[in-house]
């Protein structure tokens, strides 16, 4: 495995911080708030190699687990991870990693980036929905109505914007 460069370590830290900031930009809903964290997660997957994307979002999750209020609504701790949004938080790590892997395999074109990011978001939906079903005891359809349907339009826009920014930022970041 290739060692991380100083530049890559810096980008990992920056994306952990960006995810924390984007988590705070939210529209509160009764059970699960809409926020910009998934935007930062797929942007991370679009710009960093898989191991760096995994580390960046993993650091974000670890910061929240040890008590630093980086999760949506300035929440933190193990209790947040085992709450309604815990599945999404766990899903962020895999979403960033999978987005980066698919970007490497499928290529850097805009539509290919959008597809890779959509798969990453879908994985996050799966984790979030299953987690919510287990905690709440709700059926799949009820859980989908709380955990996926309200998020779809905004997440499509986040994917489109993240893919656009990836193309523009990649050139500047890796000169």
Where are these regions (language model features)?
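Short helix-perturbing small/polar motifs within transmembrane alpha-helices
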Residues: 14, 21, 78-126
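Membrane-helix interface segments
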Residues: 5, 50-55, 106-112, 139-140
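Membrane-embedded alpha-helical hairpins and interfacial helices in multi-pass inner-membrane proteins
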Residues: 74, 108-175
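Alpha-helical membrane-inserting segments
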Residues: 18, 22, 26, 44, ...
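Non-cytosolic membrane-interface motifs at loop->transmembrane helix junctions
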Residues: 33-38, 78-84, 141-151
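Hydrophobic residues within alpha-helical transmembrane segments
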Residues: 14, 58-62, 86, 94, ...
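Interfacial aromatic-anchored transmembrane helix boundaries in multi-pass membrane proteins
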Residues: 23-33, 61-95
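Hydrophobic transmembrane alpha-helices
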Residues: 1-54
